[in-house]
């Protein structure tokens, strides 16, 4: 893609309403535009990142055995009345009526609808376990939306829902999602720490929030530093092996970790002082087992091996890709701008022509653009006539992992300069070696 043809509305000044780093950088880099309180349009650069975040989420959900569906944003109030949540849900839920005066709502979540789908088709334990997920826009009328897409009213969510015959099956499903989440965040360059969360009136111990450490985090967190060195499950982890998956979960839940709401001073005191880490954190995912909370009132049951009917045991598993995009920026930026992990970067390489109009600079840039693209890399070619300093500032701001800088002096020596955005390291490469230096996206 050529910058001269790309819709990239860079802002030179930081908008006054932006309170945190991710909000400032997303606005300045032209990723998003605010349309109203807690409502944003995703512009081309931001949409590319969002799509890549969603793709990683999909790949790991699929790997863990979940199946993607798509449910509508507008739901019938009847389902929520049936579950008992319609009157319990507060003003966060947007309630509407259609032209037939039927009560509808803009879904803030999808437990009722997915349970309705399940009960319509699944009647036997032989069709279990089942895990269905979708990625869809949600709306919650937040009292005070703030921090950009970190706490907005309209947001994108991946919601997965598991259905099992009994608690043991539900726990195995929970563990699979636990491991899938570890892999998901690691692939985005994040170290997410699972922290025990409140299970509310349902009770039990199957509820975890996944927290990344960031100075701008909303929550105060306490954890054992051992988490920082724990290995992430590999791509070939066997999701069909409950013992293997359970072992990973045990390893990741043994060290102490808690948000301030769940913090236990007595247990914290048992952690060696040199291993205690108190910091701020951002929630990027939440998994939760809720048993028969919805299956009972909505009569979602299957015939078990004993010939009796059983209400299915359910769990829900949420990741917000829009929020997650902002969280990645909070965890990976510097004074110059965003530093994207390669897996979610909107483009791999910023190709910078230092002297547009110079025949040799133009020729070399065109050759490199074609060569890197043919090698499988996504290249954003700055072919504009802006001064060099402005081009460098833009490249740093939007945070592409690599910058390839082409100028007359380097061409005379048969070289171009390559800069690593994350480390700042620079090297000179022969022009002919550049396409090979950037193989296909990993």
From Swiss-Prot:
GO MF term set: ATP binding; proline-tRNA ligase activity
In terms of CDD domains, this protein maps to: ProRS_anticodon_short, ProRS_core_prok
Task: Give the subcellular location.
Answer: Cytoplasm
Q: Which domain of life is it from?
A: Bacteria
Which keywords belong to this entry?
Aminoacyl-tRNA synthetase, ATP-binding, Cytoplasm, Ligase, Nucleotide-binding, Protein biosynthesis
InterPro entries according to UniProt: aa-tRNA-synt_IIb, aa-tRNA-synth_II, aa-tRNA-synth_II/BPL/LPL, Anticodon-bd, Anticodon-bd_dom_sf, Pro-tRNA-ligase_IIa, Pro-tRNA-synth_IIa_bac-type, Pro-tRNA_synthetase
EC top class named in words = ligase
According to the UniProt record, one GO cellular component term is: cytosol
Primary localization class, coarse: cytoplasm
Q: Is Protein biosynthesis given among the entry's keywords?
A: yes
Single biological process term from Gene Ontology: prolyl-tRNA aminoacylation
Q: What is its EC number?
A: 6.1.1.15
Q: From the UniProt record, list the reaction(s) this protein catalyses.
A: tRNA(Pro) + L-proline + ATP = L-prolyl-tRNA(Pro) + AMP + diphosphate
Q: Which NCBIfam families match?
A: PRK12325.1, proS_fam_II
Indicate the quaternary assembly: Homodimer.
Family affiliation: Belongs to the class-II aminoacyl-tRNA synthetase family. ProS type 2 subfamily.
What is its biological role? Catalyzes the attachment of proline to tRNA(Pro) in a two-step reaction: proline is first activated by ATP to form Pro-AMP and then transferred to the acceptor end of tRNA(Pro).
Q: What is this protein called?
A: Proline--tRNA ligase
The encoding gene:
proS
């Amino acid at each position: 893609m050529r910058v001269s043809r790309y819709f990239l509305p860079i802002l030179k000044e930081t908008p006054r309403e932006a309170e945190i780093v991710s909000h400032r950088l997303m606005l300045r880099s032209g990723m998003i535009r605010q349309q109203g309180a807690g409502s944003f349009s995703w512009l081309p650069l931001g949409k590319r990142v969002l799509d890549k975040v969603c793709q990683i989420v999909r790949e790991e959900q699929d790997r863990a055995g979940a199946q993607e569906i798509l449910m509508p944003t507008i739901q019938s109030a009847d389902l929520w009345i049936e579950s008992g949540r319609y009157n319990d849900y507060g003003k966060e839920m947007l309630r509407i009526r259609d032209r037939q005066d039927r009560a509808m709502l803009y879904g803030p979540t999808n437990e009722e609808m997915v349970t309705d789908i399940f009960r319509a088709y699944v009647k036997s334990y032989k069709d279990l376990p089942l895990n269905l997920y979708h990625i869809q826009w949600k709306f919650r009328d937040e009292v005070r939306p703030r921090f950009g897409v970190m706490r907005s009213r309209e947001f994108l969510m991946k919601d997965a829902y598991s259905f099992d015959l009994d608690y043991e099956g539900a726990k195995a499903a929970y563990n699979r999602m636990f491991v899938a989440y570890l892999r998901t965040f690691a692939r985005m360059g994040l170290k997410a720490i699972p922290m025990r969360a409140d299970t509310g009136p349902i009770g039990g111990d199957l509820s975890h929030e996944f927290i990344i450490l960031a100075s701008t985090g909303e929550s105060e967190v306490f954890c054992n530093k051992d988490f920082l060195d724990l290995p992430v499950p590999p791509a070939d982890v066997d999701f069909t092996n409950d013992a293997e998956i359970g072992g990973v979960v045990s390893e990741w839940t043994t060290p102490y970790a808690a948000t301030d709401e769940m913090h236990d001073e007595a247990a914290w005191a048992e952690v060696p002082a040199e291993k205690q880490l108190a910091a701020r954190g951002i929630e990027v995912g939440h998994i939760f087992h809720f048993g028969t909370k919805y299956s009972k009132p909505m009569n979602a049951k299957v015939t078990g091996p004993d010939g009796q009917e059983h209400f299915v045991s359910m769990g829900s598993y949420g990741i917000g890709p829009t929020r997650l995009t902002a969280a990645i920026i909070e965890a990976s930026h510097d004074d110059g701008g965003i530093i994207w992990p390669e897996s979610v970067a909107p483009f791999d390489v910023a190709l910078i022509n230092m002297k547009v109009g110079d025949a040799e600079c133009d020729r070399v840039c065109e050759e490199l653009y074609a060569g890197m693209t043919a090698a499988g890399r996504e290249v954003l070619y700055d072919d504009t006539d802006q001064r060099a300093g402005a081009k460098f500032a833009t490249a740093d701001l939007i945070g592409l992992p690599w910058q390839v800088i082409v100028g007359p002096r380097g061409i005379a020596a048969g070289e171009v300069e390559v800069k690593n955005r994350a480390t700042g390291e620079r090297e000179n490469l022969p022009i002919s070696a550049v396409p090979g230096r950037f193989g296909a996206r990993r």
